[in-house]
Design a protein with these regions (language model features):
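Extended, charge-rich intrinsically disordered regulatory tails
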Residues: 314-320, 324
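A ligand-binding cleft/hinge motif common to bilobed small-molecule-binding domains
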Residues: 165-175, 300-313
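Short, structured coil segments at secondary-structure junctions
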Residues: 111, 176-179, 264, 326
Length: 379
């Protein structure tokens, strides 16, 4: 699935709402409690006596704040003095999403039923949302990069959750005066850091305790797997993806995927590529480095069926020369049949378990994969 991120937007209030969506610029209250965020680098939660402040750090300049939100109980009078930020009355009762990733978090919080609009509905598999789209309760807002403003106004969400994008603005939202919530979870480099953003989303629905419980379980499972991996010194080599046209995009060693591979006890062929983004390489350059690698991981999208070794070879004959192909050690995710992009960010423990089962099956005997399957077996 291709996830398209909505660009940075001008955040204003929703048409017809009260002054509760004004942006406050004073800090008369003192912080009563700083809620601990253990892994995520992109947000902070400050607890005050009468409100909660969410601070989203700028992913491209961590010394600066991208946006702040001040959450105030909708059933109480708005306090006279509030910390800096856009005021949102909670719990939020109507929400729209530009990405299925954020909707996946709300689903884990049992709040998918609050959805009134989504972008690119073909990427949503949650039955609550697909049924809502079918019966007209949820509006198809069009592409994430060009939202249908008229439909957005008609859907009347209190907030629109988006992924911020660097160096761009969306001025059409000035007309809508909608509270746009910028969730930058996709910029986190660690799997647990990305999953911890459920605490950020939960604050809008007053489900903080549930989010803490969910994340604690994920954290426990993930770290237990890491401890198992630490008991073995074997580090099989691995490379990822395949070429797109003439270009093969290779994830950096500091990337989200790179961290998964390290934690799963594999030696990523580009672990020394000191960046979190991807680099474009030619097939020849990838082949020269990865031809003898032990394993090959691929993500693809095919509604017709699962990829086979023969099918992979037919895509490009030279794929068959890789050692991992010859030894039938190619594992893949068919994103058309598994909700990897929708649910995977909130299931890093399951993704890690899949990878441990690939590289060190003796550590998880009898394990049944969730996302990654050998091409011989499919899912």
């Amino acid at each position: 699935m291709k996830i398209k991120y909505l660009a940075l937007v001008t955040v204003l209030c929703f048409v017809g709402c009260t002054n509760s969506h004004q942006k406050h610029r004073n800090s008369a209250q003192s912080v009563e409690q700083n809620k601990e965020v253990s892994y995520a680098k992109g947000f902070r939660i400050n607890r005050f006596k009468y409100c909660t402040q969410l601070i989203v750090m700028n992913p491209w300049d961590s010394t600066n704040v991208l946006e702040s939100y001040v959450l105030v109980d909708r059933n109480k009078k708005l306090p006279a003095h509030l910390p800096d930020g856009i005021v949102v009355r909670t719990p939020v009762e109507r929400v729209a999403f530009s990405s299925s990733v954020h909707a996946g978090m709300w689903n884990r919080l049992n709040k998918a039923g609050l959805t009134v609009g989504v972008c690119e509905p073909e990427y949503f598999s949650n039955p609550v949302i697909t049924q809502g789209l079918s019966d007209g309760r949820i509006t198809d807002l069009g592409m994430a990069t060009s939202i249908n403003i008229e439909k957005l106004i008609a859907a009347a969400p209190e907030i629109l959750v988006v992924s911020p994008f660097e160096n761009t603005k969306r001025t059409e939202f000035e007309k809508v005066k909608l509270v746009v919530v910028k969730d930058a979870s996709y910029m986190e480099e660690s799997p647990l850091g990305r999953a911890e953003w459920i605490k950020f989303e939960a604050a809008f629905t007053n489900e903080d305790k549930l989010a803490d419980h969910i994340f604690a379980k994920i954290e426990k499972n993930y770290n237990e797997l890491c401890r198992k991996v630490a008991t073995t010194t074997l580090r099989p080599t691995v490379f990822t993806e395949k070429k797109f046209g003439d270009i093969w995009y290779v994830a950096g060693g500091k990337s989200y995927l790179g961290r998964f591979l390290r934690d799963a006890g594999a030696s990523y062929m580009w672990k020394d590529l000191n960046q979190s983004g991807s680099m474009p390489f030619t097939f020849e350059k990838v082949y020269a480095k990865a031809v003898m690698a032990d394993y090959w991981l691929i993500k693809y999208n095919d509604k017709r069926g699962n990829m086979t070794y023969e099918g992979l070879k037919n895509e490009y004959q030279l794929y068959a020369n890789f050692n991992a192909f010859r030894h039938k050690q190619v594992f893949a995710i068919n994103t058309a049949k598994t909700p990897y992009y929708e649910a995977g960010p909130m299931e890093p423990d399951k993704v890690l378990a899949d990878l441990v089962a690939v590289f060190h099956p003796e550590l998880v005997p009898g394990y049944k994969p969730t996302y990654y399957f050998n091409l011989q077996k499919g899912n």
